[in-house]
């Protein structure tokens, strides 16, 4: 039976510790639905837990008209550092036999759905260990006050990372990610109709996000995509990401297309979608179950 708990009183992040985990999945969900992930992705989480994965779920604050994705990503990154540090501290005191497993970065990977995929991409950029290269990418794609605001947010996140650097390592980069119906273009679903108000809505907007991905040539080397043939929301973004990711230095590049629509990962037949993950690296994505 899956049971989520809070590891920090002032953090919305929920964790389900599996008694015998073979991996640790970190999850960020879709626009609106990502603010109540335990209910919206109930079937997905039960499936993954049954497959022997511990889960770390990062809920999004319910702010339907907040398109400042940089600020949200920065808050997620700071919370991520704090949660990871607390997991290590807690296990040291209460379950030292499990400490090595949860302290090993190779046991962690990311799973995102829809807008949650954009946050995972931003998190990898924000946590880049080469600050000079990261800043060069930001200067190439952002201007004026936007760049100033991002630099301020990054300094705040970097300060939090320095506090816990002895306990954790670079755990965004080099952790495999699987993106389900990735959506980076600020599309909103109203009465089952996908609406993309403006290519310049949001921060970073569609143009800026694409620029950041295109210029981050050292990143995104461990990413797989799953898309759906009836998805009218993420189709353009999937095409863009597939084109970009094929240029990265993959050992295996995965893009699987399934029957279904954009919100298929929230359905009750999630076992038809669930990835069969292998024990190490991007090889985890070499097999995916078919419908």
Regions found by a protein language model. Give the residues of each.
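Hydrophobic/aromatic beta-strand patches that form the interior of the parallel beta-sheet core
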Residues: 26, 56, 109, 176-178, ...
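Serine-dependent carboxylesterase/thioesterase catalytic core
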Residues: 77-78, 85-87, 93-217
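Short, highly selective alpha-helical patches that border small-molecule cofactor pockets
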Residues: 41, 120, 238-239
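Short, surface-exposed "cap/lid" segments of acyl-processing enzymes
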Residues: 6-63
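C-terminal catalytic-base region of ester-bond hydrolases, centering on the histidine
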Residues: 184, 189-291
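Short beta-alpha junction loops
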Residues: 59-65, 182-184, 229-230
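Flexible, membrane-associating and regulatory peripheral segments of lipid-active enzymes
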Residues: 1-27, 76, 85, 96-99, ...
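Catalytic nucleophile-loop/oxyanion-hole region of alpha/beta-hydrolase
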Residues: 58-92
